[in-house]
């Protein structure tokens, strides 16, 4: 009897120490996507403007406009998406004649705020990197270096929180960010040179 009691205690301990990381996936995906999107889209926009205009003010203003527009867009998109999910879950509970537990339902406002905040957190990195560097080439280099470090951190953070392989995650995020910046810079430079 003592042995079965100790086995039960061990099972309870095992259950309490086991954590289902898949439950984190929804908010983790939204946070990483928002921050990564803010980082890459703002940096790419700044690189594109920097390809044709060497003026620091133009680069910073374009990055700031991109940050504000992107944060608003992400917030609205997340609000609409989560509100649709909310409506579906409420309708299903009503069909099943189940008492609606509001605290278990997703919050569209929280999701919108979190998405806008995550986007802004990512977007601020290239803005700060460019803001204090007057010389054109050094400004471009500082944006690329700051974005590279941030992409690696975001990739590692996403992997660590989701208990996934960190190197692969960081490499994937880094390659995607570099590709976006290179394509934007290259195409804008080409259009600027040939006046297309």
UniProtKB/Swiss-Prot annotation:
Cytoplasmic side: 1-31, 81-112, 161-172
Transmembrane region(s): 32-52, 60-80, 113-133, 140-160, 173-193
Record Pfam families: VIT1
Known role: Vacuolar iron transporter involved in the transfer of iron ions from the cytosol to the vacuole for intracellular iron storage. Involved in regulation of cellular iron homeostasis. Vacuolar iron storage is required for seed embryo and seedling development.
Tissue expression pattern: Expressed in roots, leaves and inflorescences.
Up-regulation conditions: Down-regulated under iron deficiency. Induced by iron supply.
GO terms for biological process, alphabetical: intracellular iron ion homeostasis; intracellular manganese ion homeostasis; response to iron ion
Classification via InterPro entries: Ccc1_fam
Topological category with respect to the lipid bilayer: Multi-pass membrane protein
Vacuolar side: 53-59, 134-139, 194-196
Keyword presence, Transmembrane: yes
UniProt keywords, alphabetically: Ion transport, Iron, Iron transport, Membrane, Transmembrane, Transmembrane helix, Transport, Vacuole
Biological source species: Arabidopsis thaliana
Gene Ontology terms for molecular function: iron ion transmembrane transporter activity; manganese ion transmembrane transporter activity
Membership in a protein family: Belongs to the CCC1 family.
Protein name (database record): Vacuolar iron transporter homolog 2
Compartments, as annotated in UniProt: Vacuole membrane
Extra information: Can mediate sequestration of iron ions into vacuoles when expressed in the yeast ccc1 mutant.
Catalytic activity from the UniProt record: Fe(2+)(in) = Fe(2+)(out)
CC annotations in GO: vacuolar membrane
């Amino acid at each position: 009897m003592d042995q079965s009691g100790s086995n039960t205690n061990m099972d309870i301990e095992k259950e309490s120490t086991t954590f289902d990381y898949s439950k984190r996936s929804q908010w983790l995906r939204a946070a990483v996507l928002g921050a990564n999107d803010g980082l890459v889209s703002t940096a790419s926009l700044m690189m594109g403007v920097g390809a044709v205009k060497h003026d620091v003010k133009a680069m910073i203003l374009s990055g700031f406009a991109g940050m504000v527009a992107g944060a608003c867009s992400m917030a609205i998109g997340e609000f609409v998406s989560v509100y649709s999910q909310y409506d579906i879950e409420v309708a299903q509970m009503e069909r099943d004649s189940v008492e609606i537990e509001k605290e278990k339902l997703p919050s569209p406002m929280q999701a919108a705020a979190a998405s806008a905040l995550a986007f802004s957190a990512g977007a601020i990195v290239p803005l700060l990197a460019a803001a204090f560097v007057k010389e054109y080439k050094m400004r471009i280099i500082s944006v690329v270096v700051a974005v590279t470090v941030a992409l690696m951190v975001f990739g590692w953070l996403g992997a660590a929180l989701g208990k996934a392989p960190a190197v692969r995650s960081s490499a994937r995020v880094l390659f995607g960010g570099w590709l976006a910046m290179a394509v934007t810079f290259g195409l804008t430079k080409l259009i600027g040179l040939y006046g297309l």
